[in-house]
A protein has these predicted regions:
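A cross-family "folded-core" feature that marks the main globular domain of proteins
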Residues: 1-184
Length: 184
């Protein structure tokens, strides 16, 4: 039988592992929010209650690293506490990791995910479905979208580098006309 202390100890190990896998400094609140989430998820599992994660597909597509870490956490919970959580719990845990990584609050994660999804769909539509989503270039594109979304959600001013250097802007407009139209 697992106790709150076991949940906290395991969460501490999981947060240490997550931190070792992510280059950014995570929000310190991850330990508390993840510990609470894990405790409640285990309690729900014992009561036979499972929640579907409506963002699972988007998390899978746009936050694969965080989802992989969420799956790792679910597996560690199964291995160390003998509790088999539903697959969607990996997505919920990923949302906590996204929140900690981007320093947003949990209420913003669904909106952030929707924004990244909408921008990626605009680009995919613009290029008529020809974006290769398995490439490093596409992964970098998603990273840029995530950080754009983070800055927007934090109401940070976006640096307008191109407007400060008309020569660069003119070069981009001429050399990368199609990409410029998509971004615009």
């Amino acid at each position: 039988r697992s106790s709150d202390l076991e949940h906290i100890q395991l969460t501490s190990e999981l947060v240490d592992y997550i931190s070792s896998q992510i280059s950014e400094i995570l929000n310190e609140s991850l330990m508390i929010s993840l510990s609470d989430h894990i405790s409640f998820a285990i309690e729900r599992q014992k009561q036979g209650i499972a929640f579907a994660n409506p963002l699972m597909d988007s998390i899978h597509d746009y936050f694969p690293e965080e989802l992989a870490l969420g799956r790792y956490c679910v597996e560690e919970i199964r291995r160390k506490l003998d509790v088999a959580l539903h697959e969607d719990e990996a997505g919920f845990i990923a949302m906590h990791i996204i929140n900690a990584r981007l320093h947003t609050n949990m209420g913003q994660v669904p909106d952030l995910t929707k924004l990244v999804n909408a921008c990626a769909e605009i680009a995919d539509t613009f290029y008529r479905g020809k974006l290769d989503k398995t490439t490093v270039a596409y992964e970098r594109f998603l990273v840029h979208l995530k950080y754009l979304a983070k800055r927007l959600f934090h109401s940070q001013e976006l640096p307008n580098v191109l407007s400060r250097d008309e020569e660069i802007l003119d070069f981009v407009r001429r050399k990368f006309q199609k990409h410029y139209r998509c971004a615009k």
